[in-house]
Amino acid sequence: IAETGAGQHGVATAAACALLGLECIVYMGAVDCERQKLNCFRMTEMGAKVVPVQSGSRTLKDAVNEALRDWVTNIRTTHYIIGSAVGPHPFPDIVRDLQSVIGNEARAQMLNQTSGEHGHVTFSNGPGRLPDVVVACVGGGSNAIGMFTAFLGDTHPSKEPAQGHVRIVGVEAGGEHGPWLPDGTETDKHAATLTNGVVGVLHGSRTFLLQTADGQIKETHSISAGLDYPGVGPQHAQLKASGRVEYKFATDSQALDAQRLVSRKEGILPALEPSHAMHTTMELAKTMRPDQIVLVNLCGRGDKDMLHVAKARG
């Protein structure tokens, strides 16, 4: 079994089960089923059973709830392939270690591409350079922890040790306005857990989450299904608490603008999730020198979002 928000993890699980001849059940919030119809169809075409979750906010949190209920009820016959760096131990560690291929490969490629001459850019003939900034979007946090892990212990070679490490930035879903309206009033139309959350327990881990004073989980909002989650992986909570990683947010409209700009300038159609990271990347770039390097994790393709984006654009 698996849970999924954006649907990509569900598709991967369905593909693996089809190859191995295993029964596959994927839990997905009913709202996400509607806005990710393409991935739902891909899963069912590979033989998976997609279960729309109708409880709660009908998004990723509720899909995780149902998957965990299934798993603990049928633990002797069921294996839960969790889709993010959330949940009880050892799930966050398992996901981090498997996703670390993202950061390890990116780090190796960065060092290779910045040694000598590549294309129209000539770098020093020495050993390659690490990026000045690493950026990724954060919902539950799987793609981000996979990217960040490879750089957590690095000090940039162009800096003195006292000046700090490679800068790492996670970008959450700011929803309609971010956690606050223009007049400073708080709003719940977002999923910026690390920006505006408090410490609590969700899905078996102690982390930052969006909850009321009575401890009830708040409903969240994001145009991107994969970031629409009221908690975050506990490793990100620790990285925020330690100050090693900065966490920012981008709103729905900023993500839509970034998606269109990347599509038209690069010929790459990014998913809505990494489009949040792209917005922040472009804002950071305005403050940097031309010779500095930003590494951004474009963790998903936008095909799955096109119907949803078309509706949002009117």
Question: Can you annotate each of these PLM segments?
Answer:
Residues I1-A16, L20-G29, E117, S124, ...:
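A short, small-residue-rich loop immediately preceding and capping a beta-strand
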Residues V101-Q113, E283-L284:
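Phosphate/ATP-binding catalytic cores across multiple sugar-kinase/actin-like superfamilies
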Residues V138-S142, G146, D252-R313:
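Claisen-condensing/thiolase-fold acyl-transfer catalytic domains that form or cleave C-C bonds
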Residues H9-E66, W180-N196, D305-A312:
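Active-site-proximal loop->helix
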Residues K61-R96, Q113-G119, F123, P127-G128, ...:
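Active-site/ligand-binding loops adjacent to catalytic centers
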Residues I1-H9, G56, Q99, V135-G140, ...:
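Active-site nucleophile and cofactor-binding loops and adjacent substrate-binding regions
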Residues M28, Q54, I81-A85, A136-G139, ...:
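Short beta-strand segments
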Residues V11-E23, F148-H156, H279-R289:
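Alpha-helix C-terminal capping segments
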